[in-house]
Amino acid sequence: QCFYEKAISPEDVETDRIWTDFHNLPLYSHAGNEKGVWNFDAKRPADTCDFEKWDREKTQASWHYGATGDGSKGEGLYQGMQGARIRYTPTTAPEMGTETKRNMEVLLEADPAKSAGQGFGSAGQYLDVCIKTDTDTLDGYGLRIIRTAAHSDAVSMYLIQYVRGQAQCISREVVTNCFVTGCRIWVRYENGILSAKAWTVTEPTVVQQERGYARGVELTAEVGRRENAENTGLLIWHTGSLGTENWRNTTMLHGVSILYF
């Protein structure tokens, strides 16, 4: 048991910065996508309907916390179903002060189990990291990390806008080898400008260097100040298959931080 020496007031609660490494969170879906709590579930996105196969429920949970292997180091949160997603929408109330903060950024720490740079089991599978999102209607902005048929040792990254659950590209596409162990993914919205960066300290292979893949990614797009101005949610959506042993195609998440400003 833990005790605090005095009653907790609204001033004691930091509402503009949220961080978790997932290890002590209950990994289940909350009815009604409740605000102020982390919501873990699985759903098939609309743009995956042409996938030849889709892994049905292989386990009883959409997410697991623990150790796997290959490129995923240590312990962390990883997918238990294809289409696994995380949604978080903060509680907004005048006494909390969050309703006046329209800008937002997120930093995600990720280790793909795939260690060659391709990130996912098959072409077309992707990870979306979205901010300024209505997590019910799925309207917002983000970064897509996707494996394509063109590369077996790299992924493509580009900015997206979600409109009622349908994603569309809103930036140039960058082919990169940085989606490997130790990948850091940063997405930011500030005054109508969406930007994203991705990088890693893992060195590229000789072949990756010869092929000229970007070692890191920086993307920017103007999205306007009015559209999605009231949205404050985070969406992380992984459409990759699980692979053998139910983890060899997964991506381990070690931590996420959200800042409102």
Predicted regions and their residues:
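Extracellular glycan-recognition surfaces and repeat-rich motifs
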Residues: 26-84
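Carbohydrate-binding surfaces in secreted/extracellular proteins
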Residues: 106-108, 179-221
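Short, aromatic/His-centered strand-loop micro-motif at the edge of beta-sheets
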Residues: 161-186
